[in-house]
Amino acid sequence: MLSYPGELQGCRVILYLVGHHLYLIPTTISMCGCPEEGAYMRRLWGYISIITATIFFGISATLDKIMLSSMHPVTIGAYTYIIAGIFLFFIRETPLREHVLNAINRKGESEARIKRNDYLILLLTALLSTVIAPLLFLTGLGDTTAVNASLILNVEVLFIILLGYLIFRETLQLKDFLGIVLIILGAVYLLTEGDFSTILRNVAVTGNFLVMAAAFFWSLDTVLSKFLSRKRDLIFISGVKSSVGGFVLLIIMLILGINTELPLEMLPYALGVSVFSIGCSFILIYIAIREIGASMVGALFPLSSLFGAIFAFIILREPFSIMQGISGIVMLTGVFILYWNGK
């Protein structure tokens, strides 16, 4: 039986990534024991890596929102994940591959072989994280603001904890219940926009709930991906998941007769999400895990939601009210409490 303070914290690290995208990694890959010489610089690079990853991931909602002005959600999802898959497979064929894999894996603690049953789990999680979840997210994003969408994604950690408890019987500490309550309080305000009287007639509220539904499917992917987390070649697994999702969405696009055009002016935004928000964030997060530990990365990565709201406010000129800010901070506090180990 897994223990939440250890294993589940490691799981959350990947939540967002693969949240847009990948899978979880148990805390056992955390490698904070740096040698004395250069230890400070290694930890510094670890913090720089995770902050950079949060910025890259945070801007994704804003870039998606811009693309929604000219493209269908299915089209955006298809091209985004196809490009991400190409990028990850490209990285896998470069010398950077071994550096990334060595940062992820500990000698003797990873499995080199991917079994037949693993491919079934890989297919299932690919459908959850790169087909269903992005469709819900992009459709919801079209009806709400990127500010709200970024902040609402924090409910992923709540779903991961609840699913971990229900499926794997993860143990919860007293402080975890406080964190859960804070996340729920912040989410309730953001989901309803503080107006319960018009909740059923408010299009923006519908969009908010679609974003929350996307967060659920991404969290389900994270929990189920536990069965893949000990594989050595996680770049391959991530590339397969992205590619499967992209091509499934492409098939859906063709069957439904959706416009397949990727406007030239939208190409930089699609590349930004695919290469930086998905691909580079994936690599940077694992580097950070190696240098500063999974728990610290898990506590810092939710800052991506705050960066996302700030980007939407500055670039899209979306409203960012004081109450939205307070709700976001309340949720971030809840996430931090869930990851805080008292050390």
From Swiss-Prot:
The chain crosses the membrane at residues 13-33, 44-64, 71-91, 121-141, 148-168, 177-197, 203-223, 244-264, 269-289, 296-316, 320-340. It is a multi-pass membrane protein. Pfam families: EamA. It comes from the Archaea. InterPro entries: AA-Vitamin_Transporters, EamA_dom. GO terms for cellular component: plasma membrane. Residues 55-192, 216-340 form the EamA domain. Signal peptide: none annotated. SUPFAM superfamilies: Multidrug resistance efflux transporter EmrE. Keywords: Cell membrane, Membrane, Repeat, Transmembrane, Transmembrane helix, Transport. Belongs to the EamA transporter family. This is Uncharacterized transporter MTH_841. It comes from Methanothermobacter thermautotrophicus (strain ATCC 29096 / DSM 1053 / JCM 10044 / NBRC 100330 / Delta H).
